[in-house]
Amino acid sequence: MGKAVNIEHVEERVESELMPPPMYKVILNNDDYTPMDFVIEVLQLFFKKNEQDATDIMLAIHNQGKGICGVFPFGIAETKVAQVNQFARQNQHPLLCSLEKA
């Protein structure tokens, strides 16, 4: 008739299926040429930061060499990095966006 099911095995499988995806930090790196106003624009346009948050992150980038724009699942982080880097190149700025595991 029916097949016996190992409850512990099912619970373990369900638990592993519900694991959240690995998260990645999207980072903007400082350079000596990109204007601060452009960095603020990028933060507002691609990361939906308000003016104060964008300014705070821009100052962190300027003073510490890099700043975290947000933490996202890999696919979203990868897309944002590509969008920001393309936007920077289109506007002739060397601003570099990268990602690292959170």
Curated annotation (Swiss-Prot):
SUPFAM superfamilies: ClpS-like (SSF54736). InterPro entries: ClpS (IPR022935), ClpS_core (IPR003769), Ribosomal_bL12_C/ClpS-like (IPR014719). It comes from the Bacteria. Pfam families: ClpS (PF02617). GO terms for biological process: protein catabolic process; proteolysis. Binds to the N-terminal domain of the chaperone ClpA. Belongs to the ClpS family. HAMAP family: ClpS. Involved in the modulation of the specificity of the ClpAP-mediated ATP-dependent protein degradation. This is ATP-dependent Clp protease adapter protein ClpS. The gene is clpS.
